[in-house]
């Protein structure tokens, strides 16, 4: 597949061991205003570019996710086979990086027009206590993403295995007002394989270009 991400330097790599994603580049933590480190970091770490997408070669199967959304409905990643899936990890009271990611994804959907129906955006919470059905609903409504993004929440016991499976580092500040976390967007093709990794400051045009290609695979 010749995607827009091939034009970027491959400044990040992902290793996959025993069915678990360990993102070498996903250890750069976005504290949403804070600097944090994971208490239990991934086995291998490397610095990552925050201004260019990366192609994952070869693609690898995406670890499945089974969590509930803000409506209490169970959602799994495998449910979206046949679509391009853009997966990210955020929290709804983040002051900067998370809203930026969602705004860029919203703009990408607008650029896609009718083809946006081929894309499913999924967000997984990194704040089990702060992200509630009510706050998530308000977050989605404020950003015109109601019905356009599945925002999955749960308890720490439910979310922590998902973070580990995706190599996402999470650490709340002592006052729990902010959460340091890996801030990337994973591009998953229609066959359920992760093929690309986008930085938090992704350009909507990258997604508008790549999403139809992901949906066709």
Explain the meaning of each model-derived region:
Residues 173-217:
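Thiol-/selenol-based redox modules, centered on thioredoxin-like
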Residues 1-64, 68, 217:
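N-terminal targeting signals for export/organelle localization
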Residues 69-70, 189:
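Short, acidic, Ser/Thr-enriched surface-loop or helix-capping motifs
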Residues 117-131, 148-157:
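Thiol-based oxidoreductase modules, predominantly thioredoxin-like and allied folds used
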Residues 75-76, 195:
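Generic structural signal for well-ordered beta-strand positions
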Residues 77-105:
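Short active-site neighborhood of thiol/selenol oxidoreductases, capturing the structured segment around
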Residues 83-84, 101-123, 141-142:
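Conserved helix-turn-beta segment immediately C-terminal to the redox Cys motif
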Residues 137-182:
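Short, internal strand/loop/helix patches
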């Amino acid at each position: 597949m010749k995607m827009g991400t091939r034009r970027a330097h491959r400044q990040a790599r992902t290793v996959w061991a025993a069915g678990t994603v360990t993102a070498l580049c996903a250890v750069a933590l976005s504290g949403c205003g804070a600097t944090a480190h994971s208490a239990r970091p991934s086995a291998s770490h490397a610095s990552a570019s925050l201004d260019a997408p990366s192609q994952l070669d070869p693609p690898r199967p995406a670890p499945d996710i089974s969590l509930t959304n803000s409506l209490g409905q169970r959602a799994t990643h495998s449910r979206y086979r046949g679509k391009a899936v853009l997966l990210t990890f955020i929290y709804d009271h983040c002051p900067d990086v998370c809203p930026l990611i969602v705004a860029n994804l919203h703009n990408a959907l607008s650029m896609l027009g009718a083809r946006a129906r081929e894309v499913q955006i999924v967000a997984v919470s990194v704040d089990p206590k702060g992200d509630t059905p009510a706050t998530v609903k308000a977050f989605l409504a404020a950003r015109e993403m109601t019905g356009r993004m599945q925002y999955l929440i749960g308890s720490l016991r439910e979310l922590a295995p998902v973070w580990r499976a995706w190599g996402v580092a999470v650490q709340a500040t002592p006052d729990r007002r902010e959460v340091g976390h890996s801030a990337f967007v994973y591009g998953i093709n229609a066959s359920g394989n992760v093929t690309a990794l986008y930085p938090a400051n992704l350009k909507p045009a990258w997604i508008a270009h790549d999403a139809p290609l992901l949906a066709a695979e």
